Amino acid sequence: MNKLIIPAAIVATGIIAASAWSQQATQQAAPKFQNKRYFTMPLEKDPTREVGLQSVLMPPAGGNEFHRHPGDQWTAVQEGEVTFTIYGKPPVVLKPGDSNYVPRGVIHRQQNLSDKPARYIEMRIFDKDKPASEAAPN
């Protein structure tokens, strides 16, 4: 009987340690963005939509999951590299001076796969009173 207690204790300790490590790894998600919003205001000729301009700082290993917006989005990279992926297409690396356009509803994501921060300016024209983004359907 004593011969079984020690191996059982070792196995139990291993299971507990693995569970704790798994929870810690799950909690350490990729860093998110730091946004600085310059303005958001209604469009003069269409008050159901609004235009906004913001600066985004993305830390190394930062990024987001696939998502979509209720409007159009333009991005211009100022510093670092931003890996931009439209769902189902190959990723594109944007560098300072590069820009891109995402039409309404297109599923996409941005990531900083480098070891340096990335900064970009983003202009959006979205439907007013709707969430700025929604997770892509599975």
Predicted regions, residues:
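Glycine- and acidic-residue-biased ligand/ion/polar-headgroup-sensing regions
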Residues: 69-88
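Short histidine-centered beta-strand/loop micro-motifs
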Residues: 64-69, 86, 111-113
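Ligand-binding loop in jelly-roll beta-barrel domains
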Residues: 91, 105-129
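A short beta-loop-beta micro-motif enriched in histidine and acidic residues
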Residues: 48-50, 61-74
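A short, N-terminal "cap"/entry segment at the start of jelly-roll beta-barrel domains
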Residues: 2-6, 14-55, 100-101, 131-138
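Short beta-strand segments in beta-sandwich/barrel cores
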Residues: 63-65, 81-85, 99
